[in-house]
């Protein structure tokens, strides 16, 4: 059979055009919308996934959306502590954070992880600006404890975000920038705490009145009975999620709590998606199928 290079090229071009056209209704729907994206998991370790994520953020911005990135950096913090010969300890799933450890957390999150992502985004133009929860009073934290065997246990300078002042982020959005937020935050006395990036992202999405919260993780979405692959949930509402929370795997709880807080606080939809898939954010925002698990306000999930 004779090959037809021209026909093959046209066929490939037509396929690309159909992909672009599929995005049209979503471009119309989300033009001008704010999307808060929690960056974490393999997406912030694998070099190819890092590059793809940065491209996604630039694509969103140039397509008329306003992405806001919130990131943690657990693996990088652990690696730096080991490099410095400092002992790392976890209690009840939380990192024990001494003042010395907090210095490392601050250095790694804002000075390493945040700067790297800002640099990757800015390879495509002067879009990204790094900031932390300390800047312009963005986050205020309250110290928290861990629970071990039913008992409250001190874990040092670990906090929950209790208030958000989004003015500085809104200023950057209005200037056409992509804010990249490191999750460290002072308490009312100015003592800086390490705060969970998932819950910080949920709080920021609520405060910004975002259209979407997107949380990257290392699984396909929410499983009600992990590791049973058939228990993957693609869509549920806030009431359904709240009922499931006590039985979820510990690593998924803060992500789903962030989604719950966001939709309870007025964000129309929140998503947990597989960050191991390159360009998963674009697939979520601009395709009909979407990816991962979508959380909706109460009364709008699948029954």
Curated annotation (Swiss-Prot):
Q: Report the InterPro entries cross-referenced here.
A: AceGlu_kinase-like_sf, AcgluKinase_fam, ArgB, Asp/Glu/Uridylate_kinase, Glu/AcGlu_kinase, NAGK-C
Predominant subcellular localization, coarse grouping: cytoplasm
Which residue positions does the secretion signal occupy? none
Q: Which reaction does it catalyse?
A: N-acetyl-L-glutamate + ATP = N-acetyl-L-glutamyl 5-phosphate + ADP
What is one Gene Ontology biological process annotated in the Swiss-Prot or TrEMBL record?
arginine biosynthetic process via ornithine
Q: Which SUPFAM superfamilies match?
A: Carbamate kinase-like
Q: Which positions in this protein are listed as binding substrate?
A: 73-74, 95, 194
GO MF, one term, reads: ATP binding
Keyword Transferase part of the UniProt annotation = yes
Where does the UniProt annotation locate this protein? Answer: Cytoplasm
Q: In which pathway does it act?
A: Amino-acid biosynthesis; L-arginine biosynthesis; N(2)-acetyl-L-ornithine from L-glutamate: step 2/4
Which residue positions hold the site described Transition state stabilizer?
38, 255
Chloroplast as a keyword of this entry, yes or no, is no
Q: Which GO terms describe its cellular component?
A: cytoplasm
Q: What EC number(s) is this enzyme filed under?
A: 2.7.2.8
Which key words tag this protein in UniProt?
Amino-acid biosynthesis, Arginine biosynthesis, ATP-binding, Cytoplasm, Kinase, Nucleotide-binding, Transferase
The Swiss-Prot or TrEMBL record describes its family as follows:
Belongs to the acetylglutamate kinase family. ArgB subfamily.
Function, as annotated, reads:
Catalyzes the ATP-dependent phosphorylation of N-acetyl-L-glutamate.
* Name under which the protein is recorded: Acetylglutamate kinase
- Gene behind this chain? argB
């Amino acid at each position: 059979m004779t090959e037809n290079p021209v026909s093959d090229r046209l066929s490939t071009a037509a396929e690309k055009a159909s992909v672009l056209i599929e995005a049209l209704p979503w471009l119309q729907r989300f033009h001008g919308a704010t999307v808060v994206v929690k960056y974490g998991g393999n997406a912030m370790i694998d070099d190819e996934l890092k590059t793809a994520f940065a491209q996604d953020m630039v694509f969103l911005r140039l397509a008329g959306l306003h992405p806001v990135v919130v990131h943690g950096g657990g693996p990088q913090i652990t690696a730096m502590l080991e490099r410095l010969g400092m002992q790392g300890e976890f209690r009840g799933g939380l990192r024990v954070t001494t003042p010395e450890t907090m210095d490392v957390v601050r250095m790694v999150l804002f000075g390493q992880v945040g700067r790297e992502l800002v640099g990757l985004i800015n390879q495509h133009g002067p879009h990204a600006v790094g900031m932390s929860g300390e800047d312009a009073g963005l986050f205020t934290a309250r110290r928290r404890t861990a629970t071990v065997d039913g008992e409250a246990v001190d874990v040092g300078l670990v906090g929950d975000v209790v208030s958000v002042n989004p003015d500085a982020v809104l200023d950057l959005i209005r200037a056409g920038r992509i804010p990249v937020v490191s999750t460290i935050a002072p308490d009312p006395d100015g003592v800086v705490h390490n705060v969970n990036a998932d819950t910080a992202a949920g709080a920021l999405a609520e405060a910004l009145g975002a259209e979407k919260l997107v949380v990257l993780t290392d699984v396909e979405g929410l499983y009600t009975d992990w590791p049973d692959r058939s228990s993957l949930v693609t869509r549920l509402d806030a009431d359904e999620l709240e009922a499931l929370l006590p039985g979820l795997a510990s690593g998924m709880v803060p992500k789903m709590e962030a989604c719950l807080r966001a939709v309870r606080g007025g964000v129309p939809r929140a998503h947990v998606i597989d960050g191991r898939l390159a360009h998963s954010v674009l697939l979520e925002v601009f395709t009909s199928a979407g990816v991962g698990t979508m959380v909706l306000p109460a009364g709008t999930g699948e029954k």
